[in-house]
Amino acid sequence: EIVFVSAGMGGGTGTGASPIIAKIAKELNALTVAVVTIPESTEGLLRLKSVADGVTKLYNCVDAMLIVNCDMMMNVIDPNWTMERVRAYVDGVLVRSVQAVSQIVSRYAEIQLDFADLRNAMTNSGISYIGIGSGTGPNRAKDALTQALNSPLLRNQDFRGARYVLVNMTFGAKHGVTLREHDFILKSLCQYTGYNVVL
């Protein structure tokens, strides 16, 4: 029912194969979500042109596209990290992005969203954005929300007027979400996006 197409754009495999896979998924009536990385601008104009062409082709074949911009990720990555660690970090962001969406309709979720609602929110939604945050202690909800809203993945976008916001809260088994935390997060998101949004 749902297909995630994850690819690094700019090379032959991700740029060439991902639109074909996504097109097949759409033809099979699957909700099709692309989660892609685009390389740093230091990789040169020819590579970036290939990226732009690939993103455009893939965009036309999916319902929603999440873009992980490596230039923006540099704001949170230690420049002294090895390239192997940087790639592992970016891959981890891709994994968490897919998990965040898939867990919303998971049968293990405390508040489960019907798949029809997810489809309604994401079908033909175009470019989508994701913020990821975490927190511990008495201010964990506020800290996690602040991190998520300041995530480089959001790229300083203005989300007032957004139609849908999907919210996935994950807590430890012994420390479930409290009513106060739940209400704080949802009310804060309404203020951030405008009160016409569907959460």
Task: Describe each PLM feature range.
Residues 1-199:
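Tubulin/FtsZ superfamily GTPase core signature
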